[in-house]
Amino acid sequence: MKAPFRIGQGFDVHALVPGRALIVGGVHIPFERGLLGHSDADVLLHALTDALLGAAGLGDIGRLFPDTDAAHAGADSRVLLREAFAAVRAAGFGVVNVDATVICRAPRILPHAPAMVANIAADLGIDAAAVNIKGKTTEKLGFTGRGEGIAAQVVALLMRHGDET
């Protein structure tokens, strides 16, 4: 018997560096530094993509969009998310809900969370009420606490198509 529900967990980290735009959850956030990465380095969307792919048993973002492929250089992570989600849907799953935590000293996430929620809901074709985003600090501990980078953790619940009640 195939399980009607699948849970995926995603995690990502990127360093904050000068000279890059800061994009989190598809939102451009005014800040003096941005995230370093092969694509736009959207730490939240990368963790979400991993959570969705993992729940569906489809690997991870690095397998689908390797950083060794020049085609993904500077890529918009919302485009990557939509492509990954198309594979998840093709595997027979839809999203029930997403719960995410963005961990950083600065900038503050809460003022930008509604726009992030709207982007994710639109990209996944789900109600905004099914997406939750929290911002947390580590009380000045570790690399996020020192402001050296941003981390994100995401849990996603998928439901197999045809199992709707």
Curated annotation (Swiss-Prot):
UniProt binding sites for a divalent metal cation = D12, H14, H46
Q: Which reaction does it catalyse?
A: 4-CDP-2-C-methyl-D-erythritol 2-phosphate = 2-C-methyl-D-erythritol 2,4-cyclic diphosphate + CMP
Q: Name one GO biological process term.
A: isopentenyl diphosphate biosynthetic process, methylerythritol 4-phosphate pathway
Q: What is its EC number?
A: 4.6.1.12
Keywords of the record, alphabetical order, are:
Isoprene biosynthesis, Lyase, Metal-binding
- Protein's pathway: Isoprenoid biosynthesis; isopentenyl diphosphate biosynthesis via DXP pathway; isopentenyl diphosphate from 1-deoxy-D-xylulose 5-phosphate: step 4/6
Q: Name one Pfam family in it.
A: YgbB
Organism's domain of life? Bacteria
Q: Which cofactor does it need?
A: a divalent metal cation
Residues the UniProt record annotates as site (Transition state stabilizer): H38, T137
- Binding note for cofactor: Binds 1 divalent metal cation per subunit.
PROSITE patterns documented for this protein:
ISPF (PS01350)
Q: List the disulfide bonds.
A: none
Say yes or no: keyword Secreted present: no
Subunit architecture: Homotrimer.
**PANTHER family noted in UniProt:** 2-C-METHYL-D-ERYTHRITOL 2,4-CYCLODIPHOSPHATE SYNTHASE, CHLOROPLASTIC (PTHR43181:SF1)
Q: Which family does it belong to?
A: Belongs to the IspF family.
Function text: Involved in the biosynthesis of isopentenyl diphosphate (IPP) and dimethylallyl diphosphate (DMAPP), two major building blocks of isoprenoid compounds. Catalyzes the conversion of 4-diphosphocytidyl-2-C-methyl-D-erythritol 2-phosphate (CDP-ME2P) to 2-C-methyl-D-erythritol 2,4-cyclodiphosphate (ME-CPP) with a corresponding release of cytidine 5-monophosphate (CMP).
From the Swiss-Prot or TrEMBL record, give the protein name: 2-C-methyl-D-erythritol 2,4-cyclodiphosphate synthase
Organism of this sequence: Aromatoleum aromaticum (strain DSM 19018 / LMG 30748 / EbN1)
Question: What are the leading ranks of the lineage?
Answer: Bacteria, Pseudomonadati, Pseudomonadota, Betaproteobacteria, Rhodocyclales
